[in-house]
Amino acid sequence: MAASTGKLRTLFSAHSSLSARPSSALPALRLTILRSYATTTPPDSSISNPSNPSTTVKRPPTAFKDKLNAGPAFSDFVSGKKDEPLDPAEAYALKTALVGPAGRKKEITRLPSWLKTPIPDSSNYKRIKNDLRGLNLHTVCEEARCPNISDCWGGSSKSAATATIMLMGDTCTRGCRFCSVKTSNKPPPLDPHEPENTAEALSRWGLGYVVLTSVDRDDLADGGARHFAETVLKIKQKAPNILVECLTGDYAGDLEMVALVANSGLDVYAHNVETVEALTPFVRDRRATFQQSLRVLKAAKATKPELITKTSLMLGLGETEAQLWDTLRALRAIDVDVVTFGQYMRPTKRHMAVHEYVRPDVFDMWKERALEMGFLYCASGPLVRSSYKAGEAFIENVLKKKRGKNVGSASGKGTTSENVEKLVAGEAVR
């Protein structure tokens, strides 16, 4: 009992000594506590802390930053969430009308008649879809939700149909704000059987013209260029007379990879600038630039001058007439042969809103202007896409002018198995 009482007295005396300390010691203690927080301003203004984030100068907001932040970010495309389809009010928000009795009118939206397309349900559409699924192939027609799929796939026979095969999977490493293709930083590995399966499918259909495109694969050292070129060579082996158009990415500006694809035996090298230079940072992934796209098209033509080069632009994003003129001049300066114009249509809620629905007569006007500037062919219309009826347009308007009658055998060069082996080994096919 005496020992317990002694302990209590000791604790009490220690507490009393702490309480009896002068208040002058407290400010030093408080200063130490405040300094333990990195974001707290010291009480003495003469004390400076260079590492303090609160002292860094913030850049004033800019119109570019505000506009970019208001739109979808890269993370929106890699979230893995399922896309929600747009309702008419969001997809066609620029065409509105007030309907209903007085005092209870409500605003509704109207779809321009020139943008209406039928629902794909033909037997030929189903046959092509089944063939693609059986060979584990993808098409940009489906992945990009092209409005022309019922027209392109709905012919009376497979030979009358047009399908754009999308190589290297259905997942892209870029997040362009207009495109509904799935996005991921780490897409699945390439299918080594895809070149052979693609060639097999196309040889079954007996097509005279095919369009190959691909997702961007920035995760691969060559951007997938060798895979792309090998597919072209396999197609030419199985169907030497088929005309092949390749709509490629920019391969992160690697012009050696551009040359590799250009030398693979294709007939048309296509790469889309998508929009005018001023809008490119808002529309495309930040890794894609307008000038880089021009360099790709220029390199393809320089590698093989007899190639047809082609590009495509979307209208309705907010571009001006002067900007379109500048774009066409830049394309002609590097000898691009074919250009197409189409209406941008917002695919999902995550993507850019439509700025304007361009009238069909305006598309006709730009077609005339492009032809007057020296383009060999221009397809221009609200529903025109880069590969829309590409074979028909190519055969009727480009090959007859540039290659004459013997176009079927013009692209048989460089299609031997020896070239395929060189390609896989990393050598350019000449």
Curated annotation (Swiss-Prot):
Compositional bias of kind Low complexity: 40-56
SUPFAM superfamilies documented for this protein: Radical SAM enzymes
GO cellular component: mitochondrion
CDD domains, A to Z: Radical_SAM
PROSITE patterns documented for this protein: RADICAL_SAM
HAMAP family: Lipoyl_synth
Protein name: Lipoyl synthase, mitochondrial
